[in-house]
Amino acid sequence: MSAKKSRILVLDHVSPRGVEVMSAEPSFEIVVKPPMKETELVAEISGFDALVVRSQTKVGRAAIAAAPRLKVIGRAGVGVDNVDVDAATERGVIVMNTPGGNTISTAEHAFSLMLSMARCIPQAHASMRDGKWDRKSFTGVEIYNKTLGIIGLGRIGSEFARRAIAFGMRVLAHDPFTSLSRARSLQVEMVELDDLFARADVITVHMPLSERTKAMVGRDAFAKMKKGVRVINCARGGIVDEAALADALREGKVAAAALDVFEQEPPPADHPLRAFPQVVMTPHLGASTNEAQESVGIEIAEAIRDFLLSGEVHNAVNVPNVDARTLAVIRPWLRLAERLGRGVSQLAPDRVEDLAVSYSGAIGEVNTQPITRLVVKGFLERISGCDVNPVNAMVTAAALGIRIVENRVCALGSYSEILQVSAQRGKDSACMTATFFGSADNPRIVRINDRTVEAAPEGVLLLFANDDRPGIIGHIGTILGHHKINIASMTLSREKLGGPAVTALNLDSEPSAEVLKEVSTHPTIHWVKVVKL
C-alpha cells in the first residue's frame, strides 16, 4: 500500500515555477486554485497539509481551525498581515515567508519613480496619447550631481543608494540603527534627520510604518526642506503625511512627488494628490515584477517541500528552530527575550554597533540561539526597514552593521539564572537584566543599566531619573491620577540618601506627551522615558 500523499493547496496565482518545484515531488498532491474568500477557504481547506498564498487570500482563525491536517502555511512574499499568525501558532501550524525576495523590485520601482518624476515622463506620455506634440511643458531636471536623502538604509534603501551613486548623486542617509561603518561601505554620509531635510534635493523613504515613523515626513519636515525638493514614498502609506504634502505642493515648496503607497489603499477618487499634474502615482506596484513573483514563489515552494519531507524549517515567523527537549527548557525565556530586546531598543543610543546577549546559570548551558534571535527580533522590529522574524533577525542585524554577541557571565547577586541584553555605541549604552521569581510565569526586570529595580516586563513602563527628595512620588502620582492612569507597581532605586535615583513604574495605560511634559516639570526630575514592552 502506497504512503499517503501530502496535499498542498496553492492560491493567489503563485508563480508556476514554484508550483513546478512542489509538483516534482511524487509524494505531494498539488491543488492550484484562484484567490478565495475566507468562507470559501473554510469550506476547502480541511483535507490539506500545507497552504501557499500570496497577499489576496486572507487566512484567518476560522480557516485555520477548519484544517485539522494543516501543518504549514507558506506566504510567497514578506508581509504576513493576511495570515492570523497567532491562531496558527496556537494550532501548532508553522508560518513561513520569503524575506528579501522583493528587495530589488521595490528598489528599482522607487528609482524608476524618481526618474519619471524628474523628467515628467508620465505627463509627457499622457500628452502624446492625447495627440499633442508639446516640447515646452515638460522640462525636467537632471539627477546627476543632485543630493539624495534616504530615510532608512536597510535592504531596499541600500539598493537605492547603490543605484543613485552610479548615477552620480551625492547620497545622505538617516537611519539610527545602521552603523557608520555600514554607511561608509556604501559611500553614504550618515546625517541627522533635520540635516537631511535641509540638504536633500530628492528625499526617498524606506522605513517601516510605526508610531515613530507615522507622519515622519509631515508639515514640520516640509518646513525644513529646501524649495523645489522632490519626495518619493515606496515604503508604507502614512510615513508621508499626504495632506501636508498636498499643501507643500500647492505652496511650491515641493516641486514634485511620487508615491506607490498610500494612507488608504486604494486612495479615494477625490484624493487631493490626484489634482497635481507633477505627482506620479502607482497602485502599490513595488513588488510587482515577474522576477520578484517568481523568486518568492520558488523560495516558498522549496521551504514547503523541505519541511514536509524532512521537517526542516526555513524562514518561520512563529517558531524557533530547535529540538523539542531544548524547547521545553527555554520556552519561558522566549517571550521574555523578545520583550527585553524591545525594551532596550527604546533606551539605546542611535546607530547601535554592538548588541550583547548574556546568560548566567542553567539557561546558559543549553542552545540559546533561539532566545538570542528573539532578543534581536524584539530589538529590530520597531526600527528596521523590513519585517523581522527569528529566522532573519541575525541577517537583518548584520545588514544594519550591528554585531551580535552571546556571552556566558557570572551570577548577578542571588539570582540563579539571568538574561541580560545590552546595546552599545562607543561609550553610550543601555542595558536590561531579567530573571524569574519562583516560577516560569513570574518574570521580572531586576536591573536597568546600573540600577536595581523590580518591574514586570509587560505593558507600559515609565522610567525617570531624579534626585532623591521628598515629594517626587507624590508629584508623579498626582499627575497620573489626574489623567486616570493607574500605577500597577513601582520601584525606586537610589545610590544614597538624597543622591541620584531611578524610578520605574508599571502603568496600566500609556501616558500622553502632555502627561510626560507635566511629569518632567519637577525641578529634580532629569529625564523621563516611556518603554512599551
Give the location of each predicted region.
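Short beta->alpha connector loops at strand-helix junctions that form conserved
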Residues: K33-P34, R54, A76-G77, G92-I104, ...
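Rossmann-like adenosine-cofactor binding region
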Residues: T57-I64, P176-P272
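An N-terminal-biased, well-structured beta-alpha scaffold segment characteristic
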Residues: M1-M96, G218
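Phosphate-binding beta-alpha-beta segment of Rossmann-like dinucleotide-binding domains, i.e.
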Residues: R91, T98-T147, R155, E159-R162, ...
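Residues in the short beta-alpha loop(s) of Rossmann-like NAD(P)-binding domains
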Residues: V14, F177, S493
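Rossmann-like dinucleotide-binding domain for NAD(H)/NADP(H)
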Residues: R91, V95-M96, R219, K227-L347
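NAD(P)-dependent dehydrogenase/reductase Rossmann-like domain
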Residues: S288-L533
